[in-house]
Amino acid sequence: MNDLMEKLKKLLPTGNSPVLLLSIATGFIVAFLIAGFETLTDDLLLAEISSRPLWQIALAPGVGLLLAVSIIHFFGKNSGAGTSDEFVKAFHERKPRLPLRDLPVKLLAGAATIGLGGSLGLEGPSIYAGATTGITLSERFKNWLRREDIQVLLTAGAAAGVAAVFKAPATGVLFALEAPYRDDVNRRALLPSLFAAATSYVTYINLVGTKPVVPFLNDPEYRIGIDLKSVQVGSGESMAWFDASKLAELFTGVETGDLFGALLLGVLAGLGGRSMAWLVRWSKTQSRKTSFVPRVFMGGLLLAALAISADAAFGSPLTIGPGIEAMEWVVSPENGLGLIALLFGLRISATLVTLAAGGVGGLFIPLAAQGVILGQFTGELIGSDRPGLYLSLIHI
């Protein structure tokens, strides 16, 4: 076996070629892992739970927490509920290590948490899957790599995970390079991350399709500066058209009210981000300090109460899941400020309770949902005739 490995090693060119080849392999493997994870979590579990009677929907997050915490406790071997933060932690270690045996544990715990209604996102387990795949390949082929290539493949794997789950390769690269805050490694990891993210994205969309993660944001009404109300648009089965002389009217100018709204939104988002960071740290501390049974029981009870409250207020248990349904609900022009503010409070409470109870998942999608709710609230508060503008701004 050693002779075979030596012969293969001689066939490979020196320099960056091995790490680039392994980055492509990482992206390919990660795409399959995340496609399976998303299908189980979103298309099978969460879709099934969402169609059940309210009492079953309300109880499901508690069952998911029980399963997730049990999986971590009995099969994790000292592994906690962390996902994307484990990637950052491993990156800063002298010898990064994410055991492959923990990967199925994290994915199953994440599927139980999110698929049964916990208010966390798919991106956390996806980043963990990518980082673990990258570092595992670097260990298997360490004789072909330089020592610093371990962190490079770790970063490339995380980029592949984000690129797949968000169907956005550029987002994957930016996240993976910025999250660890280490410029010298980021420069070396740029090209491998691009290779891994592109491979993961192309493979993933061929497996699951190109449906946007947040479909309504593709609507032109929610794009910056576009005002479809002022132009008559015709449409056919496969195209839309308008009078060329009306083209200038399609793009509205920036008004003083828009600038004030953007300033207000920036202040609110900044304050909210700082507050949320503190609350997340507090929730994770409670998860570590409180014993197994009380935190799962209280977490399930609180999530059930939040789901029932949301159903009473909005006609749907919008606290369930990562928050896509909540985003789709909040953009309706019929919703008043009071209901939008209530949804903001209920959603953030559900996310914090899921974390404190030991749920496994990411925070990016739930926080993006909070951003959409906050953007719509700001637009309605200042009486904007284009509240969708602030949904676009919050994603910038």
Question: Would you name each region that the model predicts?
Answer:
Residues 1-394:
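Alpha-helical transmembrane segments and immediately membrane-proximal extracytoplasmic
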